[in-house]
Amino acid sequence: MESTTVLLATSTLLLVLHASYGQFPRACSTAQVLLSKECCPVWPGDNSSCGEVSGRGVCQDVVPSNSPVGAQFPFSGIDDRENWPIVFYNRTCQCQGNFMGYNCGECRFGYTGPNCTVRRNMIRKDIFRMTTAEKDKLIAYLNLAKHTISPDYVIATGTYEQMNNGSNPMFADISAYDLFVWIHYYASRDAFLEDGSVWADIDFAHEAPGFLPWHRFYLLLWEREIQKVTGDDNFTIPFWDWRDAQQCELCTDEFFGGTHPTSNNLLSPASFFSSWQIICSRPEEYNSLRIICNGTNEGPLLRSPGRHDRNRTPRLPTSADVEACLSLTDYETGAMDRSANFSFRNTLEGFAVPTSGIANRSQSSMHNSLHVFLNGSMSSVQGSANDPIFVLHHAFVDSLFEQWLRRHQPSLDVYPEANAPVGHNREYNMVPFIPLFTNGEFFVQSRDLGYDYDYLAESGSIEDFLLPYLEQARQIWQWLLGAAVLGGLITAVIATIISLTCRRKRKTKISEETRPLLMEAEDYQATYQSNL
């Protein structure tokens, strides 16, 4: 009864929506704007472009990254997403201070207030620590977003060439939820080549350094969109801690839908999500017709947890797998793609064995293993965001990224500046977002972006105190080891001299009091070395 009440109340909510995020601002989808290549909408607060009169931002030329990219995509100038968003727009709003948005009408993450000067930190909770009312509200919010047309954004239904270079706009309305399904599809879709074929080894959101910053930004935008659709500024994305899970704990009618009694691929009719229609789930069809997903409904949400290829994914990640992954010190290595060894990013993404860090294309682990395990809409990269479990899964992946950032304290220079796969260099604008943000801007700790995770916030104070000392220890451990070896040699020499001059005294019985002290010292050194 409580769940029904929440759903009805939320469904009848009077919406007052403001600037949003996504792909193409509705205000920039006309032929006039596309031909001018200037996407600098007016901020209603002062009726000036980008809120310039109020000092919120200015309309500026887009300056794409000129750093060389990797060899994975050996083409240039054939895909609309290259040097984003130059193909569509070469001028956009550049917001100042703590302002943000396609027209600088909002606050940056972590700030609020009329002038975006009030600092704010939100906590994302483990879904299994949420109250019944909170869970019901989450489901109601998702349903509302699924059935509410985004007032500020539209999706492209054709390439720039198919739009006749802007003179024939091809855009469509989309719901607030499906907007983010489409964004995930568009960033990961294959590229159309000039000879009529497609190039599959391209992805602006996966299989490269940008995987974690891109999804961090994506989740923040998704979270804020839900806040706007519902009018609930306190909403945060929950997460699913899947460490050591033996089954899909969220695949029940209480959460995101149990299994249909007569079909293993469908959801239980008792679940609200059984009526959901999915989009962008037919990449082979789009490629053969050389079309872009247009947001048309393509059938029910599919999920069949545990009925997957167990040779590829024998089990879900364990706590030991997670800890082994977090212990990797290098964010990115080698070719910076799915072949990277000892790369934290590649291991967390699931292309490398967590216990060794060695890439293995025959196995799907960590993040990838959940997509394979759920065995349905989640198992297709381009359409995986159709399943609402996607958001909770990626929120936990983001929390592991956060753990790594806090543990290793990397500088921005750790994120590769050049030679990463196309779209993944540090200064590359993330595809397909407007307003523009680079990969490097989200290679920062979550608290700098105004949010935290409940299980990290609870242990954060002790961790924050110890981290500087642990980092210093990591930096000097080799020096300490060398000093210990040198000290041992000196001690041996001195011992030899004493031995030659004091043979008789060496025969004296060692007192019982000294033995435990020496043993304790040896044990301490062994523990210290193993900890390092």
Swiss-Prot record:
The chain crosses the membrane at residues 476-499. Residues 20-475 are lumenal, melanosome. It is found in: Melanosome membrane. Keywords: Copper, Glycoprotein, Melanin biosynthesis, Membrane, Metal-binding, Monooxygenase, Oxidoreductase, Signal, Transmembrane, Transmembrane helix. It is a single-pass type I membrane protein. It catalyses: 2 L-dopa + O2 = 2 L-dopaquinone + 2 H2O; L-tyrosine + O2 = L-dopaquinone + H2O. Residues 1-19 form the signal peptide. It is an enzyme of class 1 (oxidoreductase). Cu cation A binds at residues 184, 206, 215. Cu cation B binds at residues 367, 371, 394. GO terms for molecular function: copper ion binding; tyrosinase activity. Glycans are attached at residues 90, 115, 165, 234, 341, 375. Binds 2 copper ions per subunit. This is a copper-containing oxidase that functions in the formation of pigments such as melanins and other polyphenolic compounds. Catalyzes the initial and rate limiting step in the cascade of reactions leading to melanin production from tyrosine. In addition to hydroxylating tyrosine to DOPA (3,4-dihydroxyphenylalanine), also catalyzes the oxidation of DOPA to DOPA-quinone. PANTHER family: LOC100125152 PROTEIN (PTHR11474:SF135), TYROSINASE FAMILY MEMBER (PTHR11474). Belongs to the tyrosinase family. This is Tyrosinase. It comes from Pelophylax nigromaculatus. The gene is TYR.
